[in-house]
């Protein structure tokens, strides 16, 4: 998914009395309040098994790039339906359904390729994006990106990413796209 930067997201999602810096901080706070949810999803045994199975395929970089090009150029590309209707995708939706701010979940393998997605994304390969690099390559426990317009969910959103691990070894990453909303609050509030 490609994000279009939004300079004045505060003007769109928050009251005019809130300064942009304060709004950005509030959005990031809302995302950080969902780190536990993201970690629970990433630790789910079905989710981890799906990532491990995808990694075992040892997909070549050329195959990933070819799939990424076909994914982006063809809305009818069969892999789109396969990755949104798989048991893994159904599990992603089930695990995130209770939080109305989660508009998308993306599960990625050790190369940044989609394992499964809760809804169609704008691209297949996330390996060139911070949502994969920060938790997988850099090993950040949680990464919250800047609020932006998300083309695949057609909403102003912030992305929260965490690693998927097998013991102490990172095997993939999970991103939750959270819609930015004036009344966004921590789960359970």
Where are the language model's segments positioned?
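Solvent-exposed, extracytoplasmic
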Residues: 25, 29-32, 79-103, 178-189
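Bacterial N-terminal signal peptides
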Residues: 5-15
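Short hydrophobic alpha-helical segments used for membrane anchoring or interfacial signaling
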Residues: 104-110
């Amino acid at each position: 998914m490609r994000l279009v930067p939004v300079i004045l997201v505060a003007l769109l999602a928050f009251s005019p009395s809130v300064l942009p810096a304060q709004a950005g901080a509030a959005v990031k706070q809302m995302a950080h309040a969902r780190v536990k949810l993201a970690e629970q999803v990433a630790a789910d045994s079905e989710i981890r098994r799906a990532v491990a199975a995808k990694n075992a395929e040892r997909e070549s970089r050329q195959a990933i790039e070819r799939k990424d090009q076909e994914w982006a150029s063809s809305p009818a590309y069969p892999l789109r339906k396969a990755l949104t209707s798989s048991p893994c995708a159904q599990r992603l939706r089930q695990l995130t359904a209770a939080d109305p701010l989660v508009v998308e979940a993306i599960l990625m393998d050790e190369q940044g390729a989609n394992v499964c997605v809760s809804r169609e994304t704008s691209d297949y390969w996330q390996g060139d994006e911070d949502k994969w690099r920060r938790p997988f390559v850099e090993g950040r426990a949680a990464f919250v990106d800047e609020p932006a317009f998300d083309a695949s969910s057609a909403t102003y959103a912030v992305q929260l990413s965490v690693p998927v691990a097998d013991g102490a070894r990172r095997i993939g990453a999970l991103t939750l796209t959270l819609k930015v909303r004036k009344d966004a609050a921590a789960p359970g509030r």
